[in-house]
Amino acid sequence: MMSNLPLDLVEEILSRVPATSLKRLRSTCKSWNNCYKDQRFTEKHSVIAAKQFLVLMLKDCRVSSVSVNLNEIHNNIAAPSIELKGVVGPQMQISGIFHCDGLLLCTTKDDRLEVWNPCTGQTRRVQHSIHYKTNSEFVLGYVNNNSRHSYKILRYWNFYMSNYRVSEFEIYDFSSDSWRFIDEVNPYCLTEGEVSLKGNTYWLASDEKRDIDLILRFDFSIERYQRLNLPILKSDYETEALSVVREKQLSVLLKRNDTLEREIWVTTNDKIDHTTKNLLWIKFLAIDQRTCYHWSCVSFFIDEEKKMAVFCDGYIGGINETSRRMFYIIGEDKYYRELYVGDSPIRSHRPFVFNYVPSLVQIPQATVIPKRRRRKRKNRN
C-alpha cells in the first residue's frame, strides 16, 4: 500500500503520473491531495511527469475538448474521426484565448481578463490597468527564476490612422499584482497569430517599412521584442498561421502565390528559447490549394509521427447562411479528408483549435494585505 510508504517516496512516484490521472487520484488520500496543492511538488511534476497532448477548441465563445483519432489512416483500416467531447471550464463567454504552460489567458465578451487552469479548475481574474483601452491584446508568459516560473502578462495596443501610429505596452506582474508601462519596445510591425513556447510569445509579423515578413518574439525576461527568420523570404509567399509542436518546435503555414500550393514548415533547432537567434527549418508537408481554396482564417496542429496536419476553419454556407465548422485532415500522397462538426451563427467568432498540455501549475494569487486594526481610544472621565 502506498499509504505505508515514506512521503518523499510517494512524492517521487506521484511526480511521474500524468496530470489528468493525478487529478483523479487526489481524493484517494489526504497526503496525496496535499501534494497536489504544494507548489514545490507541482513544479517538480511539470518537469518529470509524462506529457499529455490534448486538443481544445474555442467555439461559440466556449472551450470544448476534442477527440482526434488518426490511427491506421494510411493503411486504410479506419477512417479518421474527430469528436467534440463537450464544453469544459467555467461559465464565461470567451472572445479570445491564449495558452501558456498549462494555463489559459481568456478575454471575455464582457471585457474581463481571466487566467484559468482547465486541469485543476483554478481561476483568477486580473484587473485591467487604469490605462486599458478597448481592442487591447493580451498574452501570457513567464521567466524562469531558479526553476520557478514567474508569470507576466503583456498588454499591447496599437492605433493607426494614415501615417500616424500610437502604441502602448504594459506588463502585469503576478508577484506584485500591478501593471507598469514598458518603453522602447515598439517592433514597428503588424502582428497576428500569437503562440507561446518556453514562456515567450511568437507572432507572425510584417515589417511595412522593409516590406518583409518575419517571426517576432517577445522575451519576457528582458521585456523586449526580437526578430527571427521565416523559412522563406520571397515575396511570392504569404504567411497564414503559426503553431507549436509538442512544446519544442514551431511550425508555420505558408501560401505560395506562384503555384497552387500551401506548405507547412517545422523548425529543427535542438532547442528554441530566448537565446535562439536563428531558426532552422525543414518542409513538413505540401498541400494542393485546390482542396482548400475556401480557407479564410485557419488554426492547425501537426502529428509528426503520422506525417499529418489537422486544420480548423469556419466558412459561410447553407440555406440559412450559417457558419459551417470544419476540420480538414491532410497527409502525404495527397491524402485529404473533411469532417463537419456543426454550424454556428455568422457573427460568432471563428473556431480556434490548439494543442493543450495539462498541468498542475498553480495560478499565482494576489497578495491580500490585511487591514490594520484601529485601536479603540479609552474614554477618560
UniProtKB/Swiss-Prot annotation:
NCBIfam families, per database record: F_box_assoc_1
Organism name: Arabidopsis thaliana (Mouse-ear cress)
Name of this chain's protein: Putative F-box protein At3g17500
Phylogenetic lineage: Eukaryota, Viridiplantae, Streptophyta, Embryophyta, Tracheophyta
A Pfam family assignment: FBA_1
PANTHER family: BNACNNG10540D PROTEIN, F-BOX PROTEIN CPR30-LIKE
Entry superkingdom: Eukaryota
Residue span(s) of domain F-box: 1-45
